[in-house]
């Protein structure tokens, strides 16, 4: 079955403009790039990138008009492909993609329309800013505020008194309750924000629910992946810091504070009242126990189980998680011991 092309570039980018993005001087005759492609499939008028030894063979046979390439691979680029040599090929490639396919950078209405659908349910007391798009089936509750040029997808629910900033995208089937959302926030489909935290106490031989009376604060420029859940705080807010990016299927429990510009991969679970500093990176399927502090710029490997605080700037891996050097030393020692048997 042949694949459909869902993103067609209606733009072209001059090679000299790409060179400027990469901080390079452009000394040859200018030419246009009209699309992007993978190393193995890119052709005339298209640009690709390469920065990993896994793709050397594909690089050798690429037919792309141009390639953003790490310095260590520049000699391998075929003669018919123009090389933009940069230490950051993927980052420059991302900027070129944004120029070629601006609609892929910021999601828009699934219906390709602007304005408020007659099939949306908007409470009379809600305040909806200029240029807002609300798709069919979406609901906006009493006293909610939607900032200008925000898009609310089909069947999304914006709860009472929720605040959504400007230029946001709230995907289809998203629920936002008891929350304040900043500007330029992207929330992908199926995500739930502001539901009860998991609070129970054992009393009289049974589990008794502890009312969760906090909220959620999502600061500017945050992106939240599909089917992620962010619980509201028990007494104070659960906070997602400015510029932080959450992947799909991430669980953020009540009272968690995540700092600015963190990246958290899919299936990470962060238990209640844990504090994560700025610029922290967490690999997929990692779990973090409650009431911990993860220092700024720390890195946590995928599938790690974090049971104690992590100092700033350290890299921890394993289950239970420990400093990466200690983990790999212990792993090597076990291998040597196994060979002796």
Swiss-Prot record:
Catalytic activity: a UDP-3-O-[(3R)-3-hydroxyacyl]-alpha-D-glucosamine + a (3R)-hydroxyacyl-[ACP] = a UDP-2-N,3-O-bis[(3R)-3-hydroxyacyl]-alpha-D-glucosamine + holo-[ACP] + H(+)
Pfam families, sorted: Hexapep, Hexapep_2, LpxD
Uppermost EC category: transferase
Matching CDD domains: LbH_LpxD (cd03352)
Keyword Magnesium listed: no
Keywords attached to this entry: Acyltransferase, Lipid A biosynthesis, Lipid biosynthesis, Lipid metabolism, Repeat, Transferase
Taxonomic superkingdom: Bacteria
UniProt key word Electron transport: no
Pathway assignment: Bacterial outer membrane biogenesis; LPS lipid A biosynthesis
EC numbers on record: 2.3.1.191
Positions annotated as active site in the UniProt record: 254 (proton acceptor)
One Gene Ontology MF term: N-acyltransferase activity
PROSITE patterns: HEXAPEP_TRANSFERASES
GO biological process, one term: lipid A biosynthetic process
GO CC entries: membrane
Primary role: Catalyzes the N-acylation of UDP-3-O-acylglucosamine using 3-hydroxyacyl-ACP as the acyl donor. Is involved in the biosynthesis of lipid A, a phosphorylated glycolipid that anchors the lipopolysaccharide to the outer membrane of the cell.
Subunit structure and binding partners: Homotrimer.
PANTHER family xref list: UDP-3-O-ACYLGLUCOSAMINE N-ACYLTRANSFERASE, UDP-3-O-ACYLGLUCOSAMINE N-ACYLTRANSFERASE 1, MITOCHONDRIAL-RELATED
Family membership noted in the UniProt record: Belongs to the transferase hexapeptide repeat family. LpxD subfamily.
UniProt-recorded name of the protein: UDP-3-O-acylglucosamine N-acyltransferase 2
Organism (species): Nitrobacter winogradskyi (strain ATCC 25391 / DSM 10237 / CIP 104748 / NCIMB 11846 / Nb-255)
Record gene name: lpxD2
